[in-house]
Design a protein with these regions (language model features):
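Short, charged/polar "capping" segments at the starts of alpha-helices
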Residues: 1-6
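C-terminal functional extensions of proteins
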Residues: 7-97
C-alpha cells in the first residue's frame, strides 16, 4: 500500500472478501494508473459493470477513456481544488466518462 491505502487484510477485516473477489492492482504507485496494473486487474476493471474509485490519488491517476468511473474523494490540494471547482477539504462524488 501507498500512503494510506487499504490493504487486502483491511478488506478482509471489513468483510469485503465475503461479498466479492478482492484482488490487488499490482501497482506500487499512489493511485491506480492502469498502465502499472496487472493484466488480471485491467481485465476485471474493463469487465466490471460499475467502477467506484475512492481517494484523490485514484481521481488523479485512474485514466480510463470511454469508461464510466464514479470517484469519491476529499479535495486535498490546490491543484485539484481548482480542477474540480471546490474548496480544499470538500468531499466529492464525481462521474467521469
Amino acid at each position: 500500500p501507498v500512503i494510506n491505502d487499504a490493504t487486502l487484510s483491511d478488506a478482509a477485516q471489513a468483510g469485503l472478501d465475503r461479498l466479492c473477489r478482492v484482488i490487488p492492482s499490482g501497482s506500487e504507485a499512489p493511485g491506480t494508473p492502469l498502465s502499472s496494473c496487472t493484466e488480471e486487474f485491467v481485465e476485471r476493471f474493463k469487465a466490471a459493470d460499475l467502477v467506484i474509485s475512492k481517494g484523490q490519488g485514484n481521481f488523479e491517476t485512474l485514466d480510463a477513456p470511454g469508461r464510466e468511473v464514479f470517484h469519491l474523494f476529499m479535495v486535498k490540494c490546490p491543484v485539484i481544488s481548482q480542477e474540480v471547482g471546490a474548496p480544499m477539504g470538500s468531499f466529492m462524488a464525481m462521474k467521469r466518462g
